[in-house]
Amino acid sequence: IMMSVQWKSNYFEAIDPVEARKILDEELYGLERVKQRIMETIIQINRTHTLPAYGLLICGPAGTGKSQIAYAVARILKLPWTTLDMSSINDPEQLTGSSRIYSNAKPGIIMEAFSAAGESNLVFIINELDKAATGKGNGNPADVLLTLLDNLGFTDNYMECMIPTTGVYPIATANDKDMISAPILSRFAVIELPDYTPEEKKVIFSKFALPKVLKR
């Protein structure tokens, strides 16, 4: 599995800010403050040629387009992306993999994401991060996320080796950031989303959602 992944350096090519802004305007209605915050992140990437040490946490009520923002950023970065749905991850082993001593052992979701992407530089879209601390199995999935977010390397129990994570960029969504532990919250720049008015929702449906459905 490790041999199937292209392990790249963390050097990041400059992003065209005009193209980035165009993508944001295509994908998102309004949200000027959010777009400006994303553009600031892009300027930082262009200045350092590395991904920021922090990820983005998009926090707001259901139906405000949090996931859409995450996908737009992944598109701007031109990186493969994978989704971690924390509401369905009940056991840390789902993330870390299981030891080879078990007959049903296999790599975890994180290692499988690297394998599917075929490279080490990718976006992890972590949906419902506020549900990460509600594990029902042997431990807390939130503790595993910390090792992924620290960019110091991630250990998969099945692979039995350290996986470089310097090329990982996490973008998380949450409804309630107060449910997220302080250590995890400190790894993100938080973007708060207001709820849309009924009139704005009508515009979004007619000018953004409906055309995309018809295009498919």
Describe each PLM feature range.
Residues 1-59, 110, 210-211:
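Pre-Walker A (pre-P-loop) alpha-helix and adjacent loop at the N terminus of AAA/AAA+ ATPase modules
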Residues 50-56, 120-122, 168:
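Pre-Walker A (Motif I) flank of P-loop NTPase domains
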Residues 58-60, 97, 128:
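The Walker A (P-loop) glycine that initiates the GxxxxGKT/S ATP-binding motif of P-loop NTPases
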Residues 76-106, 113, 133, 200-201:
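AAA+/P-loop NTPase substrate/partner-engagement loops
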